[in-house]
């Protein structure tokens, strides 16, 4: 809960393509509901695979209920830089933040939900 309380953005570095352990699903969902308006981004520790939260049931459910943004094929460094810029320069409008997050800058993201592999 400390992370949700203290930070405006949370970057989750998942297992594989976007798996979230089922054991934390309920607690994470409750925190998302309690701290609405936070930017929550799913990244992956797999360097060349990218994220796809629709592969596993828990990830699919969490993406829908917690408004996760996905890194897809962005590197963790790109995700961090974009997130920091968005927090400093963008309003609290989630739709604007999402549009800017998925805007390609210097080929940092090639695949998104609309044009996923």
Task: Give the location of each predicted region.
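Active-site catalytic microenvironments in core metabolic enzymes, especially phosphate/sugar-handling
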Residues: 4-117
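Internal active-site segments that recognize and position negatively charged phosphoryl groups
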Residues: 1
């Amino acid at each position: 809960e400390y992370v949700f309380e203290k930070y405006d953005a949370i970057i989750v570095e998942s297992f594989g393509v976007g798996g979230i352990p089922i054991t934390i699903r309920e607690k994470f969902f409750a925190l998302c509901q309690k701290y609405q308006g936070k930017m929550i981004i799913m990244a992956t520790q797999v360097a060349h695979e990218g994220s796809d939260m629709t592969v596993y049931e828990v990830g699919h459910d969490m993406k829908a209920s917690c408004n996760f943004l996905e890194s897809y094929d962005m590197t963790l460094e790109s995700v961090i830089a974009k997130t920091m810029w968005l927090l400093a320069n963008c309003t609290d409008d989630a739709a604007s933040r999402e549009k800017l997050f998925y805007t390609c800058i210097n080929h940092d993201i090639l695949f998104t939900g609309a044009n996923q592999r």
